[in-house]
Amino acid sequence: MSDQSDSDLSAETLRAIMSRPVAEPLPDPATPFEAEEDGDGPSDMPVDADISAVEECASLDHSDTDNGRRLLRHRGADLARMQETGSDKATWAAWDGKFWDVSDGAFQALAIAQTIGGLIGLEADFLGHTPPENAAIRKAARELDNKDAQAAKDAAIAALEKRQGKRRAFGVSSKNSARLNAMLACAAPHCAVKPEEWNAAQRLLYVENGTLRFIREEDPDRSGEQAAFKGHVEFTPEGWRRDDRVTRLMPVAYDPKAQCPKFRDFVARFLPEALVPGVARAVQIFCGLGLTGIPVQLLFFHYGLGANGKSVFLEVLARVYGALGEGLPAESITGQAQGAAGGASPDLARLPGVRFLRITELPQGEPLREALVKRLTGGEKMDVRTLFKGYFAFQPQFKAHMSGNGYPSIMGSDNGIWRRMAVVPWKVTIPPDEQRDFEEVVTELVAEAPGILNWLIEGMLAFDGEGLKLPPAMVDAAKDYRDEMDPISVFIDRCVRLNPEAEPVRARHAYECYSIWSDENGRKPLSETRFGRVMGQRFERREVSSANMYFGIELHDIPPRSARPRNPDEPGSDRP
């Protein structure tokens, strides 16, 4: 058999070895592989190695660029780089078989890269002779008595063996940290995925045993002037796909027959229909809507004194949603600090792909960062910056929930913030003798997770059929909240009306009327400066003869001032 045939046999033998079951035990981990002493290290080679890919990569060189190509050829389908602006540091995502793992993406990408060195070592068996070497070998086969020809053949064989040794040695060196990082860096530009491609399917939900797709369609069984719709859900067992670019999965297996009697009883007890009619239904629809990425300009504020079930309810949902949910500290949306322009926002950078956002218990009276709340619930893209990395934009998909025993302070009087605030009144208080350990109750309810998923699905299907309409109990609660936070707007609604023919009203007189109204309604009047700012935003104000005047309005239903003395500490000394 010729030397060229020996080379071909090596490749065939390798294929046979790779396809044959391993019968011999693995060596002791404390004993180095003999191949490592020769420059080969197959111990980290994946068991499902594609030998045809190894053969293709044998033609590549020993550069970091070609190592990047090797990584893409062998495992490119399992790697993606999340594209950011202004950063050369890749944020990696790795396919774990069900979804794209971003939280551990960097570690997974490194682990994948570590398998390439062993595959490079296998390339040695697919290296062939150069054309001159082949010519020398053929000549030696024809001229067996020609010593020069035989020497040339031996040199050709030795040259190939040398290249094979170098390739095996390069495979080992490719496992070193610097080579691994260089391999990933060279592969990164070729597997970048734009931010808008991630989690783009708003009506698609990944669960533990497959995928759920929510479909809205016209309902032929309902007639009327307007088109009627209904929703249904389609389940695909093990329907996870790389191309969906989904980064989060709900850790619950879908079972259409699963029930959650304890959870339903819990909701019925603490949001009873007799006390707060329609509230439980609205909460179910909003929470069910959280299974999807459909944007909605609402924030549910769960309000009530302690021992009323709201914290248990939100904690149960947070655990059912699992990685599909995320928590945001109260400090992120309260307080006066807005952060430096263009500064890092790592708390917000964790929110892409999130469907359930829980904002931790809010301190009473702490000012709400209204501009941020509008961004979080606006349905438009948000620009965020990761720590020490670059910028990217994403469209919020989550449904936001926050809770508190008291209201956070909202200073704005515009409808932009108030129409987003949906107050859920939790009015039932557990008697002390019925109170149980928090963790015990949560654990008991979370055990019904598959049934709770069906409860959420019911809510989503109801949204597709009837939409989300806030019941009077929630509308009234939100109005009470606004009246408490924005008494000037309440005064305007009750005592000011538009009248283009009316005489101008002095700003000082308007404030005095507001102060009288506040006194008679048991409220402390806000400062004249703030009153003037709100009035100036709502109505035309001009300075006439050194006095500020409002035009096009008239005051009405101003109560007479009571005889009680005015508190000298009350505000009102500064002019608008």
Short names for language-model regions:
Residues I17, R319-S345, E366-E370, D383-Y391, ...:
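Positively charged interface segments
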Residues A462-A502:
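Conserved alpha/beta core segments of nucleic-acid transaction machinery
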Residues G353-F356, K381-M382, P396-A400:
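Loop/turn-to-beta-strand initiation segments
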Residues L79, T85-G105, L212-G353, A422-P425, ...:
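P-loop NTPase catalytic core of nucleic-acid-dependent motor ATPases
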Residues M1-V54, P560-P576:
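Glycine- and charge-rich intrinsically disordered segments
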Residues C57-G68, E366-M382, G532:
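A short, contiguous, amphipathic alpha-helix enriched in charged residues
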Residues E24, D28-M250, A393, L526:
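Intein modules and their embedded homing endonuclease domains
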Residues E361:
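Walker B catalytic acidic pair
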